[in-house]
Amino acid sequence: MNITKVVEGIWGKKWSPSEGVEQDTECDSALLDHSHLVAERFPQKSFNLDRFPLQIKNQTIFEQVNIFFDMTDGNPSLIQSYLREEEKFKQVFRKLWAYNSVWIETTLPNVNVETAADALDSENKKIRVKEIHSQLKASGSKSMKINNLHDFELFLELGLREKVSTVYIFEDMKICVWSNFDFTLPLYSDDDKYTELLQRICTTEGIYLRSLTD
């Protein structure tokens, strides 16, 4: 199976993200570049995974409470605060991974892999991400099925740290999450039953599933 078939499995014949792409727009993405199209088409099923229960519209206030990975450069006192927040998101993703076949579409083949690897905190992770980068480049693909939790967490860290954009497709639950928006991650959930489950998981881990219609 390829990523196009996986994406088709989310909506069947009801809709395809490619329908929203203008004909004169060059796009080779099955889903990665289309979070906004999904949200426009299905606002009631679209959410953000977020640190905050509501959008903070005052930018001055948001900047004072926001935290992201690059803020920790030259400021070691922030790294533990950042890692605590990151772990909350990783716990949610781990639980989704455990119950699903997981596919990704990613920009990893198109980025400077040395720069991306520098954001990872162990030599094993740096080596592995370079291996995956080479494999994807050699195959000419931007997508893969993730069977290994270690590989899954590599992409999580690279996305949350804003180094590599990736969309995660949790095939069984028909949940899609786009990562490279620091700690605000667009999400689509097709089935209300699994949306409710995800809401409980988020609450347990200390983050919010924020509706776009709130």
Model-found features: residue ranges?
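Structured alpha/beta or helical-core interaction and ligand-binding surfaces enriched in interleaved
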Residues: 1-184, 189-214
